[in-house]
Amino acid sequence: MRVLLTLLTILLTSNTLINGTAHRIHLHRQTRAQQSSASSRLSYDETSTSLDFNYHNYEQLTKYLRTMNSRYPNLTALYSIGKSVQGRDLWVMVVSASPYEHMLGKPNIKIVGNIHGNEVVGRELLLHLIEYLVENYQSDKFVKWLLDNTRIHFLPSMNPDGFEVSKEGMCEGGQGRYNARGFDLNRNFPDYFKQNNKRAQPEAEAVKEWVSKIQFVLSASLHGGALVASYPFDNTPNASPWGAVFQAYGGTPSLTPDDDVFKHLSYTYSKNHGKMSKGVSCKRVTNHFENGITNGAAWYPLTGGMQDFNYVWGGCMEITLELSCCKYPPASELPKYWEDNRNSLLKFMSEVHRGVQGFVMDENNNPVEKAALKIKSRDVGFQTTKYGEFWRILLPGVYKLEVYADGYLPKEVEFMVIEKHPTLLNVTLFSSKYSGRPGVSQTNNKRNDGVYYRPHIPSASQQYHQHQALSVPNPPDSGIFSSISNGFSNLVSNIFG
């Protein structure tokens, strides 16, 4: 009992410090702003022909993106998806042969960096990747093919406020991890397995709105503090902060219906990386990751993660990439990280052109928008764009596509996926008024509840639908048990990554 009381005291104290983060951020930001002009490691010369291997603060990042946009107007577009707590833009740069206009039949992917402000390697790698793509478009056949057939959206910093108070050389700890209100943005999304009561934060809300507007097919979130590619689910039906502590040495996987695809995507990144596939263990308390990949919940479960949200609510396959054992390594090590990750990033992005893609049209050849689709026996769905387009990453094999839309007869189509290129599949739906007409077949699949494109996993379906039925806003965290829970979550995050 004495040990338990001591542990609770430590956790409550830790949570008090966490809740005070916003005040420390404000003071730190003023100090850093005063020193930034004299800081040699935060430098960007917009007249330079290439990006230096240094860390770039918000102002320098903004200048860099604007400069690249002006230099390469035919390959880049710059937009903001919203603002941080302290008013910084969440900049996104599109790199594509068609940066301003949608390319019919061409998929959108996104790469997000710096969701934790003190995990900074990914932020800088994305700036270098932007430069690499635009500078090699004319000379590199692979790069040209990728940009001609894909629209790539880069969000270098999802947590610019947190970055401004982080310190170079701090390999562990939480300073700068959270946003300016002291919230972990990777715990701030809707969760499939558990009601998430965290107060909504503007950075996470901006990403949710972004995902709702663009049908992303593939995504990665870049982190630091470990060296591993992690894939959904991040949470489990029985997840708890206590379980996270005890499962960190090798917990129970929480697998998606697309587990084969997620493992493939993760291993594609790992095997093309300089070191990741060796299963490097960064800290004494962390696992050895076989082949450099792990199921998120098997590592440690968390509630409100971004990759699970993308998969369940966005129909987008996202993995989490932990790129460095040190969260904020010295800038002198950035060239090494770039060499280790460049090919992995390129290979990963090209995986969007695997599986099946096509159009859903009606009998008059008009696109069917927001038709709900799923691969039979894989009960997490996706939907068509306003142009009737769809994409799904799949490994070679034979599959059946189930298609549903309001006012149309449901349809089931069998197809085959091969290794070399995506399968092109066009589906025609017939109006339900033609039911019973000769030559128009029906399937036994019926839409039941208006959310048929949502996932249905037997082990968690009841709890999920209970969550969906709630109509009242989620209350903010409060009370001693919430404090204990938050304390455990933050303790686990800072220890394990």
Please annotate each region the language model reported:
Residues Y408-Y434:
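Structured interaction patches on ligand/partner-binding surfaces of diverse proteins
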Residues V356, D362-D379, Q442-Y464:
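Short, ordered, surface-exposed loop/turn motifs in non-cytosolic proteins
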